[in-house]
């Protein structure tokens, strides 16, 4: 759906949905120790569809498929390698069914999620094959775009995913986690393991986090049409958006998290309220963010509040 990119070029605002995995957990869907929320595609797919429907009712312009942790290297490690095709096809089908079921007065796009979840111990050749496989399945299943959600590096792994995603011919948006170091430089990665040691997960870095500017310079020329900050501390979003604007002149966006990770579950503690989330989102909009949504801990109430504040 290249119309999304055209809408961004026209300066329009787009509302992304909120969290998938943590919202499934919130309503009682068990998380897998290895494959996290992908397990829901096997055990309780109807609840995945209902979650998508709720985001549509809340006002989302874009639905994200439950495929964040559904690449082959993740599912094989969880003993579900034979379900790669089925889970990815099913995830797209459920999002499409939700779109068909809920009549809304706007065009709704479906974004196929790809990530580095569980991939840090996978060699480059396997990652290339696995990302190619997942990108092709998502494209064949009918997603309108691919959303690369990378909560850390190494950059070479993101490059591999980018090239495979772009090769489908679909629009690709790149989302990166960022934290701000003591020198006020934005770095690629997740602040949690840098400070308190919390938020540890299969996405965490195994080496020093590179500057975000380096990541942008290497990755955005590969063909992404938008750049977003994902799964980052809310107070790091503004300086991250500023760093993005210094190194990229295209559309930018933000969907940070609220809460804390103690795998395989999200801890809904120290949560920002939907009302306060809207207030900080207004600052992101002033910084030029055209795309806003939510990551872990940010559910349908937040999306509903964002829609009321930014009717589009």
Locations of the language-model features?
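Domain-level signal for soluble alpha/beta catalytic cores
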Residues: 1-312
């Amino acid at each position: 759906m290249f119309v999304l990119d055209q809408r961004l070029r026209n300066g329009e605002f787009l509302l992304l949905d909120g969290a998938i995995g943590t919202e499934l957990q919130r309503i009682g869907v068990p998380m897998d120790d290895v494959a996290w929320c992908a397990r829901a595609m096997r055990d309780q797919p109807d609840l995945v569809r209902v979650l998508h429907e709720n985001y549509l009712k809340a006002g989302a312009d874009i639905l994200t498929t439950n495929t964040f942790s559904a690449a082959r290297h993740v599912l094989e490690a969880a003993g579900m390698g034979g379900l790669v095709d089925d889970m990815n096809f099913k995830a797209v089908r459920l999002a499409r069914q939700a779109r068909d079921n809920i009549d809304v007065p706007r065009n709704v796009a479906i974004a196929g999620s790809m990530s580095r979840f569980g991939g840090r111990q996978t060699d480059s050749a396997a990652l290339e094959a696995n990302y190619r496989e997942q990108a092709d399945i998502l494209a064949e299943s009918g997603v309108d775009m691919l959303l690369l959600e990378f909560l850390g590096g190494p950059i070479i792994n993101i490059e591999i995913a980018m090239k495979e995603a772009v090769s489908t011919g679909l629009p690709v948006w790149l989302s990166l986690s960022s934290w701000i170091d003591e020198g006020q430089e934005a770095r690629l990665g997740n602040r949690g393991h840098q400070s308190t040691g919390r938020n540890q997960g299969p996405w965490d870095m195994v080496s020093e986090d590179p500057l975000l500017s380096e990541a942008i310079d290497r990755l955005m020329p590969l063909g992404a049409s938008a750049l977003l900050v994902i799964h980052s501390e809310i107070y790091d979003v503004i300086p991250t958006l500023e760093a993005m604007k210094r190194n990229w002149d295209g559309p930018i966006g933000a969907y940070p998290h609220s809460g804390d990770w103690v795998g395989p579950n999200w801890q809904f503690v120290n949560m920002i309220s939907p009302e306060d989330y809207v207030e900080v989102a207004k600052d992101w909009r002033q910084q030029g963010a055209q795309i806003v949504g939510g990551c872990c801990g940010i559910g349908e109430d937040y999306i509903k509040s964002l829609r009321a504040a930014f009717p589009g």
